[in-house]
Amino acid sequence: MEHERRGVTRYNFGAIAEVVDLDGRGEVVSLTRDFSYSGAFVKTTTPLPTGTRVRVRITHSGAEFAATGNVTGNVIPTGMGIVFTEIEASDRAILERWLGVQS
């Protein structure tokens, strides 16, 4: 099932997510709940603070996607939203493949 939030379609998407605080204050390894071209929601009971700059690595079906982003908000106790701010072209291609976009 897909749904729209903030003008971006979000897709239910369960994958392994590693979120690393770029200031070295912590790391979360968990699962994504939903995913879009602009961000993801990561399930965790210990979210990083809003505004934290992070490196996200998501693994699904043998492929790995990476991006830099910011924590946009916390939903205690379910997780944190992350907006992607930097995505390399090769990672963008993986994202498009996962979400079903034809190039």
Q: Language-model features: where?
A:
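Short, charged/polar, Gly/Pro-enriched secondary-structure boundary elements
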Residues: 89-93
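N-terminal helix initiation/capping motif
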Residues: 1-35, 96-103
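Short beta-strand-centered aromatic/proline hotspots
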Residues: 30, 67-72
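Short, conserved beta-turn/loop elements at beta-strand boundaries and strand-helix junctions
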Residues: 22-24, 37, 74-79
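Short, surface-exposed secondary-structure edge patches
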Residues: 8, 43-47
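Short conserved beta-strand and strand-loop elements enriched in small hydrophobics
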Residues: 15-21, 51-64
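Short, solvent-exposed secondary-structure boundary/capping segments
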Residues: 41-44, 77-86
